[in-house]
Amino acid sequence: MHILIIGNGVAGTTAARTIRKLSNHRITVVSSESEYFFSRTALMYIYMGHLTFEQTKPYEDWFWKKNRIDLVHDHVIGINTDQKHIILQSGQKLDYDKLILATGSRPRKFGWKGQDLRGVQGLYSLQDLQMMIAQTNHIKRAVIVGGGLIGVETAEMLYSRKIPTTFLVREARYWNTVLPDEESAIITDHIREHPSIDLRLNTELREILDDGTGAVRGIITSSGEEIPCEFVALTVGVEPNTDIVQTTNIATQRGILVNEFFEAVDTPDVYAIGDCAEMRFANGSTPNRVEPLWYAAKAHGESVARNICQNRQAYNRGVFFNSAKFFDIEYQTYGTVQAKRNANEDTLVWYDTKNKRLLRIVFENDGSRKVLGFNVLGIRYRQNVCSAWIERGASLEEVLKNLRAANFDPEFAPQYESFLIAEYNRKIAQNLV
């Protein structure tokens, strides 16, 4: 059996490696972005001079041949699901028995005037990084539009090269559609501590201005202010990259529609995983879901490999988790922690704004006080420990008594659990020690 994978990001590469572990099937991975798999999360460190591209490749180049995974560096221009083959830009045709689409995502645009000018771009691919390196050389000012995780990474990249940057964020606090107020305030203040970054809250982009040669010369904000710049980073999120299937019978909505086995809807022997996949659940009561996360993409790759090589088993995401970095503040989240709590939820939080540290536990506000989620800033907690507590419905009191077990390095790292226990005793009027 020949398994053909389009896309060599973490989803596609994980699928290929897991299939090889489970079988002797022929595997081909096609990518137009790069010849070899690299760590996308490390692209920013190439720009900042901390790493070379070679250092972002987790595997030596000989690894793929040794493991009988064929790599094709080419662009797919057509898919024929009836005859079960793809066509490459080089003219080559590749037949398949199973096709896995792992085409990732692309930066979102909202139809702004001037969004296609030279010097205006998103940041997702290796080509985006190369373009940013070329277009930010010797510029006087940059503008970032959008306050998500890619936005703050871009701000750190530009800051490392001492490029004055105006950072436009629509919300009243940084990422406050995701972070509760205390976390959002800590991150907002931390961004503002960097002198060359001008953070503008409650501010949106209205228009990008042309210098007359097709390049950007500035932007106009929602308040009518004109800000001169030679580079604009559009970091208002990503969307599934489905261009490759638009002329096929493969169904799409936001992403490529798949069931809980990652099988494309109504298209036999085609699968989609990672950022490009939109899961439709058979029960009909769960909304369709796109999971544009590194951790999810890795899990998708492992799951689809097992479904092809072993018994079909529905994907189970398990307890949600994610991690990020806001300049030098590490962030981890496990379970359910929303910007605004539901009526059945309460929270216990301790924070130190001076040293930029925070611990938050969200729990049910009934008698059980079952723990639902954790947010951690500036402290490292173990994902497996926190997830296990959430999965088995551990109570707030049980978690607090054993909280040190979650600390990533309890022997040498500073301990903050006692502060959260003191907050519990104050709030719940107990004497937990």
Question: Which residue stretches match the model-derived regions?
Answer:
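Glycine-rich Rossmann-fold phosphate-binding loop(s) that bind the pyrophosphate
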Residues: G7-V10, Y124, G146-I150
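FAD-binding core/adjacent interface of flavoenzyme oxidoreductases
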Residues: M1-L4, E60-V143, N202, I220-E226, ...
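FAD-site-proximal beta/loop scaffold in flavoenzymes
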Residues: D116-H138, G212-A215, I220, E225-S303, ...
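A Rossmann-like FAD-binding core segment of flavoenzymes
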Residues: H25-R26, D70-I87, L94, R161-E260, ...
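A short, polar/charged loop-to-alpha-helix boundary motif
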Residues: I379-E397
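Cysteine/selenocysteine-centered motifs that mediate thiol-based redox chemistry or coordinate metal-sulfur cofactors
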Residues: L396-V433
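Beta1-alpha1 glycine-rich phosphate/pyrophosphate-binding loop at the start
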Residues: M1-I69, M157-L179, V385
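Mid-to-C-terminal Rossmann-like scaffold of FAD/NAD(P)H-dependent oxidoreductases
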Residues: M1-H2, N8, C276-R380, N384
